[in-house]
Amino acid sequence: MNMTFRWYGRGNDTVTLEYVKQIPGVKGIVWALHQKPVGDVWEKEEIRAETEYIQSYGFHAEVVESVNVHEAIKLGNEERGRYIENYKQTIRNLAGFGVKVICYNFMPVFDWTRTDMFRPLEDGSTALFFEKAKVESLDPQELIRTVEEASDMTLPGWEPEKLARIKELFAAYRTVDEEKLWDNLSFFLQEILPVAEAYGVQMAIHPDDPPWPIFGLPRIITGEASYKKLRAISDSPSNCITLCTGSMGANPANDMVEIAKTYAGIAPFSHIRNVKIYENGDFIETSHLTKDGSINIQGVMEELHKQDYEGYVRPDHGRHLWGEQCRPGYGLYDRALGIMYLNGLWDAYEAMAKKEVGI
């Protein structure tokens, strides 16, 4: 297991690498060029500056999250060709600086969606919350206002240039159903996977969050059947997944221990977090501790250990603790606690395995 920490860059994150370095066991930083407009080529000098800064603190910079996919590609319109070519060049450029995994998603318009960024928990902390009925009755513009008011930092997948075109995008997606979105993902992968494979980069698609349609927009990476369909597109070693327990696990029909058991081999990158699911379909993000939520984090980690998992792992969204003013879900304290819990589980399974063989 290669423990990492997501960081949004200098001037774009309340957490500094000086602080991350003080968390035991963190080997790498998961990063991106968040200032780049979606669809633009990530230039070599920009990549060099960011990776050298990360490496100056003793971290590797082998995982990028995310190189976002332009809406023209998801829509499959006449503009997608140039954006796909830009994406290919970005893959080449990143590989030249040691990047081995690129996380991406194929969610139309919105990235991860929540209705409350700072929902109070019983212990006094706050966390990201999803109210299903509210989303079903909410105008997308209201959701955008909720997100914009929650932080003065741009949230990934909620870029201002995209939100300014929200009505136009919704109109464009009226003709895109799940089947069409799968066709567009297939076209994209058939184009980029030969490049990724040639340059030794694994493309790790992130599940939809939450894993069901919202605002009438299709969602296609929602469960085990999605992974089977993804691999049917191409069995390239570069056609991979990001195992995200909190995203896919928000649907209780998705058994994350079984999914880890079956698909860890094609998951070079894992996001580990817990959510508490309510009977009405709402969910709230909790601590990483297994008993605090609905996902068997302990079982997922045990399964990864059984498979001698060598992929990159990071704690995912954390609660907001001890008065920390931070990007929603991405403070320092709870993610640091999450790392210690995950490392503790891993160490315990390691000790048990050694005891079984008499070491």
Curated annotation (Swiss-Prot):
Q: Which cofactor does it need?
A: Fe(2+); Mn(2+)
Gene Ontology molecular function, alphabetical? ferrous iron binding; manganese ion binding; mannonate dehydratase activity
Q: Does the keyword Lyase apply?
A: yes
Q: Which Pfam families match?
A: UxuA
Induction is noted as:
Induced by galacturonate, repressed by glucose.
Keyword annotations for this protein, in alphabetical order, are: Iron, Lyase, Manganese
> Pathway membership of this protein?
Carbohydrate metabolism; pentose and glucuronate interconversion
What sort of enzyme, by top EC class, is this?
lyase
Q: Which family does it belong to?
A: Belongs to the mannonate dehydratase family.
Q: What does this protein do?
A: Catalyzes the dehydration of D-mannonate.
What NCBIfam families does the entry give?
A: PRK03906.1 (NF003027), uxuA (TIGR00695)
UniProt-recorded name of the protein: Mannonate dehydratase
State the taxonomy lineage: Bacteria, Bacillati, Bacillota, Bacilli, Bacillales
